Each structure stands twice: as structure tokens, then as C-alpha cells.
């Protein structure tokens, strides 16, 4: 997953712009809520846009992703920008860190790739273990409503340029509660020909209530849920059906058994 698609993903201006905005507002958010952080882990970092943006703002960054091709691009970009960011291949369910970070980030609905409760809980436990006591995690999540809605037999074009064409086809399996995204792309090569890329991705939606129970069991406390990406309105203040939600939680002194 994200292997043949990595180059297409890296070319998307939407992903890059979103992460630039995140890098802009996160330091302000941390200041507003009184969170002090130096060592930051970006889980499911992709091609490293957010990690590099935060590194430019003075944080010490480590980025991990399951896809080696994504990490290869992230390393190349960091080297070209002369940024000291440590990019490593790692599975979020088995992060190779213990009490190493003050802040852990996981965006891009990456936790929705955990298709079972067991895998989701493993990821939360690994995240808690990677944090120092008193450290914080911030992640986003597509709700069950969002996945059922977004994946309801939709098709659209995400990129259409001379260099890259990218189309998405969505499908939702109600029996399994899993959304399937099929990506078809054509990438222009130096000789003028186009390479066809095709990947399939699966995501599952979860309710904040369910995830909160798992996070508390993993060793997180002081959970707060928000309904917009600038983290300005809490979940209980929003009367609409939530789609993408955000969570901040603090690492307690307790870590669940792996």
C-alpha cells in the first residue's frame, strides 16, 4: 500500500497545502493549550510534508510510515531542503520507541486504516508507549458516518495535468462497514510515455465514544474531541453529524500491556 502510489501522492498539491496549514497552526494550538513539546513523532508521515514543516519551525522531528516508497521520497526531500528529520519505516501498531517523544501526531485519517478493533488498540498502545509521561497525542479520525457517506459509490478526478492524472472510485460494504478506494493514475515519464498506477485502499470508520474507551485503556487521559481541523469547536458543541474529528489526549503514567 502506498508503494506504486507514492509518487502520485507526492505530486498532489492538496496534500501538501493541507500539511502546510497544519504546520502553521499546530505551534499556535500548543501555545494556547499550554503544551510544551520539543521531540515530535509524526506517525503515518507520508512523504514528510508536515514533519518538515514543523522542523522548519524549530521542533525536533521523527517521521515514520509503513510504506518504504513514501519514506524514500521524504528522505530525498529533507536532504534537498537541508532539514535534519529522521524518517524511518515503521508500523504504527509496533512503533520502535519507548518514552522518546513529547508530542505524537497522526493525521490524514491514518488510523482508519486499522480495520479491526484489535489493530486500532495496538496502535494506540504503541503510541502511548512512544510518549513520555505527560506527553500528548493529536490525531484525526473519520467517523463511521463519514466513511459510509464518503465511500458511497462515488467517483471523481483528483489530479488532471500533463504530468499526472489521478482518478478515485469509492465503494462501501455495509456488511463489513469498510470503505474501499480504488486509485487509478497515469504518471508521465521522462521519455513522454505514461505509466499506469493502480492501488486499492480500505478504511473503517469509528465513533469517538468507542475510540475514547480504547485510548483510556491504552493509558491516555484528558481526552478532548474537536470537530474542525483548526480544533476550535469541541464535539459536544457541534450539533451536526460529525465526519472528520480530532482528538487531543495526554499520556498518563500508565501503559497498557502490548
Tell what function each PLM region has.
Residues 1-38:
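Conserved class I S-adenosyl-L-methionine
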Residues 44-48:
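Class I SAM-dependent methyltransferase "Motif I" SAM/SAH-binding loop
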Residues 49-94:
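Class I SAM-dependent methyltransferase SAM/SAH-binding core
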Residues 121-133:
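A short glycine-rich, Lys/Arg-flanked "PGG" loop and its adjoining helix->strand segment in the class I
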Residues 202-258:
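C-terminal lobe and adjacent flexible extensions of AdoMet/dcAdoMet transferase-like proteins
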Amino acid at each position: 500500500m502506498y508503494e506504486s502510489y507514492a509518487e502520485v501522492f507526492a505530486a498532489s498539491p492538496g496534500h501538501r497545502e493541507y500539511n502546510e496549514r497544519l504546520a502553521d497552526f499546530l505551534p499556535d494550538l500548543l501555545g494556547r493549550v499550554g503544551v510544551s513539546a520539543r521531540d515530535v513523532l509524526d506517525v503515518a508521515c507520508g512523504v514528510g510534508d508536515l514533519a518538515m514543516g514543523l522542523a522548519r519551525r524549530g521542533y525536533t522531528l521523527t517521521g515514520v510510515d509503513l510504506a518504504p516508497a513514501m519514506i524514500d521520497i521524504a528522505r530525498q526531500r529533507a536532504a534537498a531542503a537541508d532539514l535534519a528529520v529522521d524518517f524511518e519505516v515503521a508500523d504504527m501498531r509496533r512503533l520502535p520507541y519507548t518514552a522518546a517523544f513529547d508530542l505524537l501526531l497522526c493525521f490524514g485519517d491514518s488510523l482508519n486504516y486499522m480495520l479491526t478493533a484489535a489493530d486500532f488498540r495496538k496502535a494506540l498502545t504503541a503510541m502511548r508507549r512512544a510518549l513520555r509521561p505527560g506527553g500528548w497525542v493529536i490525531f484525526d479520525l473519520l467517523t463511521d458516518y463519514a466513511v459510509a457517506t464518503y465511500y458511497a459509490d462515488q467517483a471523481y478526478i483528483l489530479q488532471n495535468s500533463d504530468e499526472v492524472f489521478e482518478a478515485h472510485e469509492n465503494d462501501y460494504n455495509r456488511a463489513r462497514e469498510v470503505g474501499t478506494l480504488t486509485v487509478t493514475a497515469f504518471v508521465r515519464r521522462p521519455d513522454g510515455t505514461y505509466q499506469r498506477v493502480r492501488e486499492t485502499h480500505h478504511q473503517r470508520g469509528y465513533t469517538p465514544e468507542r475510540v475514547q474507551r480504547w485510548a483510556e485503556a491504552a493509558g491516555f487521559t484528558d481526552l478532548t474531541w474537536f470537530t474542525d481541523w483548526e480544533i476550535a469547536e469541541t464535539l459536544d458543541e457541534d450539533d451536526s453529524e460529525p465526519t472528520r474529528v480530532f482528538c487531543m489526549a495526554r499520556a498518563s503514567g500508565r501503559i497498557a500491556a502490548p
